[in-house]
Amino acid sequence: MKGFSRRRFLQASGSLVAIPAATSFLFSGCSLQGGTLKIAHNVRLTSWDPTTGLSSLDATAQSFYKAVFDSLITQHPDLSLSPGIVTDWGWSNDGSKIHLSLREDAFWHDGSQVTPDDVVWSLERAGSLTSDNPMRFIWSKITNFSISGNTVIADVKEYEPAIFKLMAYLTSYVLPKKAYTALGAEAWEKNPIGSGPYMLEKFEKNRFIRLKSFPQYWGPKPDFETVVIKMLPDAMDRVAELDSGDCDLAVNVPYEAFNRLSSSSKWEGQAYPIADVGMIFITNKEATMKDKNIRLAMHHAIDKQRLIDELLLGFGRPIDSMQVPGYDAYDPSIEIDFDPARARSYLSKAGYSKTNPVKLSIQTTRGYRPKDYEMIEMIVDMWREVGVEANIEVYSRTEHLKLRAQHKLAPAAFFNWSNSIGDPFS
């Protein structure tokens, strides 16, 4: 198994983009072993607790978390599972219990050993009714823990077929019981302790993270001794870092800049599609959005291929469901085509037309994903052609997550959605 390389920083990040392909650049002279790797990243980390709060649901923050912490189970880019902190797992014959066997060579960054008690405490904390863990509806199904040697055994209230996949997913990290309870939540943010390949050396909120290789890490030695992550939400700031030579690696590079930089021998560009979906969340805040005819009209009015060709310069692929190629539930027969005439017909059934349009608001980020705002501008123009008038409101990534948690999004809201385990229920 390879160490925690610059490629794994990309693959773990989830920051790789919605609908379009992921883009990144690596300085061609950057050593793949030892030294310091400097990354220009598009996300500002808001918390060092990977199991609670809004940031724990942010797929783009997972590269930071996976560098410092360990999930119960490890997942590879091809979605396969392999041992992490837990080396063996399974169900009882009747499907009422699970067992998790902990590796004996895992240590916390303070030098203490990772124990089965840490695993039990982490799962109990995650599933507590008072927990801020957004996945507690899953973790609360696991109860009545017992420990036998290095194995944790627990009851499962109801059969959850994806339980082990979820242990490689969001909020599934193991934290040190003794250290966390001694520090408390506030002090933890200044001195988080994990068991991952890197230790936190310095953190300046909204500015940068400096990580140092952990010599007692149970897995392969990381490729770099030190990693510095500059948090730069503005895409042009990341491009400027590349142009000035102040970083070795940048993610979520705008496509025009990608093509320009790719022509230089100084940089190695990578662009590839990933399972991070650009989507418009639809709410039922207004009566019009409860009408299926209106929702279908809005969908059939969008020319996805045109968005990809004209805005994304061909970097991306259209999809028609939340399941993407490679997921177990992917069904290629599901198609919702671009058909303006059909869209007008649906609107007519709902009592609307170009002269009597549906009116609504749509929220979008601006610069969080390449061409996110421009994409919504083009979609709004497409809607206008069939009889939907949409007013664009700009919000930040953090504002979206807060509004979504409070069920206060606008009737339509653009953001990315990612589910790396491919579970349809999740």
Role assignments for model-derived ranges:
Residues 87-132, 153-155, 241, 288-290:
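Aromatic- and charge-enriched surface segment that lines or borders ligand/interaction sites
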Residues 90, 97, 101, 136-179:
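Surface-exposed binding/hinge segments that line
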